Amino acid sequence: MLYYSQTNRQEVYEMTEPKKPPITKSFGYAFEGIFTCISKERNMKIHCVMAVLVVIAGFVLKLSAVEWCICLGLFGLVMALELVNTAVEAVVDLVTQEYKPLAKIAKDTAAGAVLIAAIMAALAGLIIFVPKGLVFLGVL
């Protein structure tokens, strides 16, 4: 693999790629990141509780396969974005602890991505669950 020198863009050098860890270690690192986020981030705990409630309601209200796919995909997206948001916040905090406008933009933008996904997931959840809930309760 060819890499450009940081000091001289004209200079190209060959570098061997670092040895990659076995796939089991890679999964271990990923799960460690997920569990760290769950244990340290309040919003991730909220997302996990909501996911459990969605699964319970899904079984009670007998969601179709398509509805399950929508629900699983959306709360998977929300949780994945929360992980990315946490990573962005950690990297920004690693780089600087003082107020910087660009650091604020990075953190706020990452948080905004989670918020948009969470709002869309909530709206989709209402569209799926409210009619089924009303039928279940005998209102419709």
What are these regions (language model features)?
Residues V92-T109:
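Amphipathic, cytosolic membrane-interfacial segments at TM-TM junctions
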Residues L2-A87, Y99-P101, A113-L140:
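Hydrophobic alpha-helical transmembrane segments
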